[in-house]
Amino acid sequence: MAAKDVKFGNDARVKMLEGVNVLADAVKVTLGPKGRNVVLDKSFGAPTITKDGVSVAREIELEDKFQNMGAQMVKEVASKANDAAGDGTTTATVLAQAIVNEGLKAVAAGMNPMDLKRGIDKAVIAAVEQLKELSVECNDTKAIAQVGTISANSDSSVGNIIAEAMEKVGRDGVITVEEGQALQDELDVVEGMQFDRGYLSPYFINNQEAGSVELENPFILLIDKKVSNIRELLPALEAVAKASRPLLIIAEDVEGEALATLVVNNMRGIVKVAAVKAPGFGDRRKAMLQDIAILTGGIVISEEVGLELEKVALEDLGQAKRVAITKENTTIIDGMGEEAMIQGRVAQIRQQIEDATSDYDKEKLQERVAKLAGGVAVIKVGAATEVEMKEKKDRVEDALHATRAAVEEGVVAGGGVALIRAASKIVDLEGDNEEQNVGIRVALRAMEAPIRQITKNAGDEESVVANNVKAGEGSYGYNAATGEYGDMLEMGILDPTKVTRSALQFAASVAGLMITTEAMVTDLPQKDGAGMPDMGGMGGMGGMGGMM
């Protein structure tokens, strides 16, 4: 085992604080409407330019092992805030730096670190309660657009496109962000249920120009097995032919004789039909087939529940107003299922989301809810260069997370004002002893750090602005973009409550751990030449003989 280097007490804390400050100083220049950019060198390709706090934090690795430990702990704050709310990473970093700096000064002055931490925790719990009271519901398109705009560094086009996407697919709809091909941002909305399975044969195509299959008012046959024998499908085909309506077959697979016969029937115009594979695999496929059944008002023909394909009647089939099938996707528009059944299914999947432990499962379940409840919107980010595209895509994703958080827990006045108001409401909070009171005051002072940093980045005098805002009430604050004071909610400067709350909680949690650190242990650096011993030359290789 390699030898270790150990530092204790003040020596350890000073080194750790240096690391915290290096990382936080690099991240905090991005805060606010006039925050600066940070350029990140990449081992290949063009450098990345970003104003995203967590992207900057992830790039930083310090040479000094003790300093690096401090930096990595603050990096954890940014990552946790990003995971919880998708935004607020820079605010969390600024808060953590402020708490650590103030807290370590108190420790150096002889305060008990454990009581300091308890005081900080008390202040944060009380401040979070105040934030919840200050929170205002965010349920109109204008407020959603404002939240998106603020999170995307005052880019109103991003805020507006996210608000439009949410309006079209609903709060539960899936909104994804992709790199577009044009210079402008584009919004592509898929209404109805779409899944990534295309037609099984190009001979089903009936719209030659678009290269797609389009079925008006089709019946939908859902089968939980492979079909290769056409005899199994005959009853359904005959019933649909009599009704003079098209048929969509969604099965695990349709192959061989069954597929060939369907193609021939379709080409001769005997019955308009198309077949696609069911989405997903294994248990997820069964669940998604059931989703489609509920959406279209049909039932899944499965031998597991004693239903046979040969005995299918028209009432077992689902129905929709329209189905569009391309090479890659199938979209079912306006399924004829009962609204109460669909809502029941959505509630059931939501419960599964709450119980799910893995992020992957949650994401897949969320997609299923969206497909049943709303639809899917794709925001295609447009830019002139690849560097700009990456930077903008990061901002759009941040803004999307922020708007989701705003819809979930509401909004508070932005620009660091909410933290100032929360702090002013708990200024009389008392701890169990004087050292806890110092911890409370450390947290209250730290809650001023975001507004000070926003003001500093805008080139204004931070103390003057902080005092003016503290003297005001409610959502009165400072708009760093224009240099004006006023009502932040009316000016459209909003932060999601969840983002502000998460930033404060994670910053205090990690900062508390750092304040109570008494020893640090790291590997001693390897001395050069400590690897393989010198081989002392290879000696002569001798003659190579008669090798050709």
UniProtKB/Swiss-Prot annotation:
CDD domains linked: GroEL
A GO term for molecular function: unfolded protein binding
Protein name, entry field: Chaperonin GroEL
Keywords carried by this UniProt record: ATP-binding, Chaperone, Cytoplasm, Isomerase, Nucleotide-binding
Catalytically driven reaction(s): ATP + H2O + a folded polypeptide = ADP + phosphate + an unfolded polypeptide
E.C. number(s) listed in UniProt: 5.6.1.7
Annotated compartments: Cytoplasm
Pfam family, one: Cpn60_TCP1
